């Protein structure tokens, strides 16, 4: 049996480094995950006047971190912190199982 050498490990390292990129590329073209769809549905119910809702799992697919972008008339005349509190309240049960959440809110421009 041949002894281990750093040169022998190079192909393994190359493959390992490419895996996250490959996973990211596949994820970019995939439809929403079940968890993303669930969060989207909850937000649609809580913000019926929303003109745009986008939920993205930014944790690499494990469901620990999400980015939420939501545009709704319900946010009109509210400060950003109040808008984010509304989203947090709507997702209070789901947030318990998350590591983190990035929220971007806006009011539609007419």
Curated annotation (Swiss-Prot):
Residues of the signal peptide: none
One Gene Ontology cellular component: mitochondrion
Gene3D superfamilies: BolA-like (3.30.300.90)
The keyword Transmembrane appears for this protein: no
InterPro entries: BolA, BolA-like_sf, Mt_Fe-S_assembly_factor
Keyword field contains Plastid: no
Principal subcellular localisation of the protein: mitochondrion
Keywords in alphabetical order: Mitochondrion
Pfam family, one: BolA
SUPFAM superfamilies for this protein: BolA-like (SSF82657)
Compartment(s): Mitochondrion
Family as reported in the entry's similarity comment: Belongs to the BolA/IbaG family.
Subunit structure, as described in the record: Interacts with NFU1.
Protein function: Acts as a mitochondrial iron-sulfur (Fe-S) cluster assembly factor that facilitates (Fe-S) cluster insertion into a subset of mitochondrial proteins. Probably acts together with NFU1.
Protein name, per record: BolA-like protein 3
The species this protein was found in: Bos taurus (Bovine)
């Amino acid at each position: 049996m041949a002894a281990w050498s750093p040169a022998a490990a190079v192909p393994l390292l190359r493959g390992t480094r490419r895996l996250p990129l490959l996973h990211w590329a596949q994820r970019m073209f995939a439809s929403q995950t079940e968890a993303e769809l669930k969060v989207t549905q909850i937000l649609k119910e809580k913000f019926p006047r929303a003109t745009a809702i986008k939920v993205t799992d930014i944790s690499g697919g494990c469901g620990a971190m999400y980015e939420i972008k939501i545009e709704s008339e319900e946010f009109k005349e509210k400060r950003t912190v109040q808008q984010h509190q509304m989203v947090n309240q709507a997702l209070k049960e789901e947030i318990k199982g998350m590591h983190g959440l990035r929220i971007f809110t806006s009011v539609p421009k007419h």
